[in-house]
Amino acid sequence: MKLLSFKKKPSLTKSQSCPDKLKNLKEQQKDPKNGANYDTATIKSYTLQQHQQQQQQQREDNNMINNENEDFSFNYFDYDEDQESTYSREERLFFSIWRNNKIKRCIFHHLEIFNLMNNINDPITLDQLNLIDSGKLRDYCKIVKIEKNEKIELQCMPIPNHIEKLIFSNEFDKPIKAGTIPQSVVEIEFGEKFNQVLKQGQLPPSLEILKFGKRFNQMVTHSTGELPTSLTTLIFGNNFDQIILKNFIPPNVSTLIFGLNFDQPLSPGYIPSSVTKLEFQENFNQPLTIGTIPKNVKHLKIFSKFPLNQGAIPQSCTTLYYGGDCNQGTKNIPDSVKSLHFLQSIDCNNLTKERSLSKSSSSISLDISGGGSGSGSGVNSTTTSEKITFLQPESICKSVTNLTIELNQGPPNKKYLPMNSVTQLSLGINEFKKPLKSSYIPNCCTSLLLNIGPDYKFQQLLSKSIPSSVTALQFGPNFNLTIMPNSLPIHLRSIDFGDGFNQQLLQNSLPTLIDSIKFGNSYNQPISNNVLSNSNYLTSIEFGKSFDQPLIIGNGIGNLNNNNINNNVTNSNLPITLNKLKFSKDSNFKSLLKIESDSMIEEIEFGDQYNEEFNNQCSLGCTHLLSIKFGENFNQPINNLPISIKKLIFGNSFNQSIKNLPENLTSLSLGTSFSQNLINLPNSLIELKMFNKDFLNNLNFSNNNNENNNENNNENNNENNNENNNENNNNTNSFNDFIKNTTIKRIKVPCLITTLNFIVEKNKSKNCSLLKFYCFVVANNNYTNLVKYNLLLNKSYFEKWSKKKEGQSPRKQRKKKIPTDQRSTKLLLVRKFLYQVFFFFFFFFF
């Protein structure tokens, strides 16, 4: 790959004063005839060399230059000279470095590379890390994944000293030798199959986070040195069930989580006082005495069939997930608990004023039953009873604002609920002998999740079933009742019907103030003209997987030629005020979609199965449309898109010509299959995203003339270079031609990490722009390289870069010899890197 470098900056004589330097450089920059290539960054670097007595004037010059070129502007920490003596030596040293724009840009550059190497979905493996040539790039990588067949031994493939996190794959199950893991590692995550005995010295003394996999079930203690003292987070897998004694857990652990099968007795002092988050799972069934739970625990999750003793839960606890004997209420739960979640069913016969549900909690999650089945949090009860029970007065405190209740056999009377505090209510109902009424729900409730079970025998949601205070309504997955007119609250703004709803909407069944509607995966009913078209406040609507009915937005007449389309729908069935139309990712929608010119829609998102051509079946005639997102399978010509569109996102199957893009387009995203020429892109385009892993090999930005020139250059290069070098030169030349003519400010190609991760940032201003080009390549999974391109560009850079001054002949371009030996190429890269690092640390420390 051909490397691009900075153009050499001209030197200035010492006889010139700083203001004269600045003035001359500005005049040379503004004069296009002198052929000078001075850019704004060069001028700015010289302004930093002015004398102290001219500091005030210098700040004004800097501000003036920064206003002309925002690409190189930074925030200065200005201070008065009289106050300079008040700063400490460290502060003066910091300001002297921070004010140097060159050093500051270098710092941000290294920060960007660090983010590029670590903000990835798939961590780099140890094999890939050892193939990276440059030591600088190795230091940037902080996360490494150990595969199944990789050996982590000092003599064959050591782990570098800069690694901070190790992730072992699920297949890894090999012993680890002492001293193999460096002291720089602070986090280790083992895979599911790891079940090896850990001995002293195998884990580094600096380790802070340790997470075991599902199958791990070995004795590990702090007293014998298996677990380091520095541990702050310790997480065991589901199979772990070893005895816990005193001093087994390191004294600095703050988060301790046990797995599903852990069921060992605990005594006071076994868990260190440093623990603030403690979790046990369903199989834990041990008595808790005073002091067993540390006094500093704030987050506690516990299961136990033994009675909860007074004082067993410390006063420091604020969040409690309790799966024990829930029928005790909150008699022995401290007042400090603000968020309470019961994980098993509660028999309301035992809930009295003395056993009320939390005296001070603001959030409660519980399952109310008469011993019936059901659970509010996924823990099922097998006992059954036909007795209908109700909440008793004052059994739930008046301070609760977030309440979750599962009612299995009968509704509660609202006088037993906190009527003046509950604003968020999740209500589950099943075997009701009476239809749902608004008297079951507090009048202060604004957000309601109504989960009606399959055993609910009523078929309709009657009028005034929900109080008028509700503004956000969500139905559960089993809801499939006919919504009668005026049954929903008049102030309702958003509604989610759930995945089970598939009933036709009736006229006046939805309130006029509603602005957001979401249908579930089962809904596939035709929408009549008089149901939603008059909803003047509706701005967003989303359809699920099964929906495949015609949609018309606007006052036009649709051309219905599809046999699957209901011929009764001829006019607009969606309101013109709609701003966003979305189909779920797995949507099967293929019917008519017609958007008239009077529509106010701005955003459309299609599902993955949509692949219809833009004709009478799909007509986008609106003038306000700004964004379209197509799914994975869309691959149709795009010749009739509205000119108002500013953002286009295509899926991985799209591979059509993009010659006729909207002239106002600012953002374009192309999938992995796209291999067309990027020609005639709109001048308004700012952001371009490409996901094709062969992007560098398919660069076809240039026009025919440039292609002919490239062919001639290739013939000359064939005499001295091999075919691989010619391909790299072609790619670089094509990329240069593209950069010369484009107005794009940002290009992203975030492909798979095993193939290509390519980011280009281009920030344009009046006369100058900065181009940053980072390329992370793992070619054929056996070679890794990170290359940085920095170009300082002005208007005449590509046209006059070979000329010294007007009237002089262009200087001869010196062709860099590309060494054929791979080792020579690596040495050149390493030497250039060492040169840059030397100057960086020189300016930083001296």
UniProtKB/Swiss-Prot annotation:
Coiled-coil segments on the chain, per record: 702-734
The keyword rRNA-binding belongs to this UniProt entry's keyword annotation: no
Keywords: Coiled coil, Repeat
FNIP repeats (start-end): 159-193, 194-239, 240-283, 284-325, 458-500, 501-546, 654-693
Ranges annotated as biased composition (Basic and acidic residues): 20-33
Highest taxon in the source lineage: Eukaryota
Chain residue ranges for the region called Disordered: 1-39, 362-384, 702-734
Extent of Basic residues compositional bias: 1-11
Entries under Pfam families matching the protein: FNIP
UniProt keyword Protease present: no
Protein name: FNIP repeat-containing protein DDB_G0289381
UniProt source species: Dictyostelium discoideum
